[in-house]
Amino acid sequence: MAVFKTTLWWLISGTLGIICLSLTATLGILLKNSFTKLSIEPAFTPGPDIELQKDSDCCSCQEKWVGYRCNCYFISSEQKTWNESRHLCASQKSSLLQLQNTDELDFMSSSQQFYWIGLSYSEEHTAWLWENGSALSQYLFPLFETFNPKNCIAYNPNGNALDESCEDKNRYICKQQLI
């Protein structure tokens, strides 16, 4: 009878131990996920080739937008002309992407798509300008002198840029700066 009580006690304590370990692991996973503030909704579907990385803790983006390095990005899955893209971004209180540096879109580095960005040629200033009127830094696109001034710029997150007719249809990236 004593052997039976000891075996039963070991069985019960072993089962309770496994339950405690499972609950601890689940709690750890839930806590880790609650501190990650990557705001992306399943309905967004930026495409199978976009790989998201952790967001910094300084931003919260609206539904269907991706938060990364204190900015919010909308990565379209539909194709529009450059002007249509610009107007759609403006309607969301944002602008077509203005790149600050070549690392800005690291979270999309596996994408092969080209997207309209907010860079176009100003005949008035005879220069490539961002939507906000600032000049293009030469280090971003070293070969920008070869771009056709009658075109707009489509950008690939791998760092490639193409000049294409502004009437062509491409996907686009809107950017909202939070800070």
Swiss-Prot record:
Q: Which GO terms describe its cellular component?
A: plasma membrane
| Domain (C-type lectin) ranges | 68-175
Q: What is its main location?
A: membrane
As for membrane topology, the entry says: Single-pass type II membrane protein
**Disulphide bond pairs:** 58-70, 61-72, 89-174, 152-166
Query: What Gene Ontology terms for biological process does this UniProt record contain?
Result: adaptive immune response; innate immune response; negative regulation of natural killer cell mediated cytotoxicity; negative regulation of T cell mediated cytotoxicity; positive regulation of natural killer cell mediated cytotoxicity; stimulatory C-type lectin receptor signaling pathway
Q: Membrane-spanning residues where?
A: 11-31
The alphabetical list of record keywords is: Adaptive immunity, Cell membrane, Disulfide bond, Glycoprotein, Immunity, Innate immunity, Lectin, Membrane, Receptor, Signal-anchor, Transmembrane, Transmembrane helix
- Pfam families according to UniProt: Lectin_C
- Supply the InterPro entries for this chain: C-type_lectin-like, C-type_lectin-like/link_sf, CTDL_fold, NKG2/CD94_NK_receptors, NKR-like_CTLD
The record's note on quaternary structure and interaction partners says: Can form disulfide-bonded heterodimer with NKG2 family members KLRC1 and KLRC2. KLRD1-KLRC1 heterodimer interacts with peptide-bound MHC-E-B2M heterotrimeric complex. KLRD1 plays a prominent role in directly interacting with MHC-E. KLRD1-KLRC1 interacts with much higher affinity with peptide-bound MHC-E-B2M than KLRD1-KLRC2. Interacts with the adapter protein TYROBP/DAP12; this interaction is required for cell surface expression and cell activation.
UniProt cross-references to PANTHER family, sorted A to Z: C-TYPE LECTIN PROTEINS (PTHR22800), NATURAL KILLER CELLS ANTIGEN CD94 (PTHR22800:SF252)
Mind telling me what this protein is named?
A: Natural killer cells antigen CD94
Q: Which organism is it from?
A: Pongo pygmaeus
Q: Which gene encodes it?
A: KLRD1
